[in-house]
């Protein structure tokens, strides 16, 4: 396995793990079927392309056409980053902050029209809203350049090309690890236990005086804020944003596959699911034509991954609905103390 292949696997693992962790909180813990997950990733791209790029244009005094202006602005900032790496780090931090705030607000607003719906209708409504926003971003050139796309800053302009992939992969992995620690801490609190209770039986949660709508809004706001971080990292890695890159297949359905494969409600299981998916995905992308000629597949190999992962999704739902690492029961500190007392006796 080549060095570049390993760095690509690590990079995609980090990106998808961030998205899948946020989806695991929404779906695995809270039971919200967020079929519009791609929207939160798109929001991260909007924060970079629609807000950060405009700020750079203002800073360098560049006017005129938005798409052309971003090209000049990113070229100017890249030259600055190449001589001063701190600027690149600052842009990354600023982009993450902007995306998190925007994602939090959009996530809360996103769920409002459908927060009181049952699971089936809720999932369909979220999908419809997400697709509508994607279409608007695709055909409105003033948001993120539409189908033409726009340039984004190269935060690693000071790193030579042969090492850029590795450095960016480690940055993404580090941020993914921080996100993992955040969710482990958050979901092992009373808030996380309430989300599990809401997933199992909303009426029970209502009986204890908790507002289901407020819980859903909080969950979606946090999940969207984290999902937007993945959008930022992806946009900065590719140094280009195009709306068509944020489809429901890549950023909604495949993350659902990873969560279900690893085990919903279990962040460690999700990591295993993401790793399995990413390894297969990267290998298929690289060797798809070799597989086509070796097996004599009578269709274009570009569709092979969609077919394979679609069949895998059905097999998981039918034979292994709990995933590779099933969710563990909740054991609170008082319960642990009681168990230790009993075992001691």
From Swiss-Prot:
Described purpose of this protein according to its UniProt entry: Part of the binding-protein-dependent transport system for branched-chain amino acids. Probably responsible for the translocation of the substrates across the membrane.
InterPro entries: ABC_transp_permease, LivM-like
Any GO CC annotation of this UniProt entry: plasma membrane
Compartment(s): Cell membrane
Annotated organism of origin: Methanocaldococcus jannaschii (strain ATCC 43067 / DSM 2661 / JAL-1 / JCM 10045 / NBRC 100440)
Membrane topology: Multi-pass membrane protein
Name of this protein: Probable branched-chain amino acid transport permease protein LivM
Classification lineage: Archaea, Methanobacteriati, Methanobacteriota, Methanomada group, Methanococci
Entry's family note: Belongs to the binding-protein-dependent transport system permease family. LivHM subfamily.
Main location (coarse class): membrane
